[in-house]
Amino acid sequence: MMEINRNAPATADGELRIDADPATVFDVISGIDRWPSWNPDVKSVRVEGPVQPGTVFRWKAGPSSLTSTLRVVEPPWEIAWTGTTMGIKAVHVFRFQASDGGTLARSEESWEGLIARLLKGYSRRTLDKGIRGVLAHLKTEAERRAATA
C-alpha cells in the first residue's frame, strides 16, 4: 500500500461511487495506453513495458509532459505511481473498494518541489480539479464498459 506525502505543499483527494465492479474500474485505470480514449485531459501515453511495479510511462496531460513510474499494481484494489514534471515530484494513488454492487473509487495525489511550494494555492487548485476530473471520466468509462459487458 502506497501513501501520498500528506506534508507536501499541495495535496488533493476525492472519491466517487461507480456503478461497475472493482475489476472493471481497475481495468480502465490500469489500461494506461488507452487513457486518451476516455480521459480528454490526457493527450498521449507511451508505456515502456507491462503494467507492473517499476514500469515507466511517459504521457502528456494539459500543458505538461510527465514521466511516471508504477509503484503499486494490486488488481483490483490499488494502483499507484510516482512522476515528475517541471521540477514537481508527484505521487498518485487510486484505491477501489466494493460498495453496494459497485465500487467506491478513491484518488489521492501529492506534489512536492519548488514550484509546488512557491505556487501552493495554484498547485492545490490544479490538483483538486485534476482529481475530480479523472474520477468523473473514470466513472463514465467504467460504467460504459459495465453496461456493455
Regions found by a protein language model. Give the residues of each.
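Hydrophobic/aromatic beta-strand elements that line small-molecule binding cavities or substrate pockets
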Residues: 14-16, 66-72, 83, 91-98
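Beta-strand/loop substructures that line and gate deep hydrophobic ligand-binding cavities in soluble
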Residues: 84-140, 149
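Short beta-strand segments that buttress and anchor functional surface loops
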Residues: 55-62, 79-85
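Hydrophobic ligand-binding cavity/cleft-lining segments
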Residues: 1-49, 143, 149
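A short hydrophobic beta-strand element
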Residues: 53-55, 79, 103-108
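Short, conserved beta-turn/loop elements at beta-strand boundaries and strand-helix junctions
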Residues: 74-77
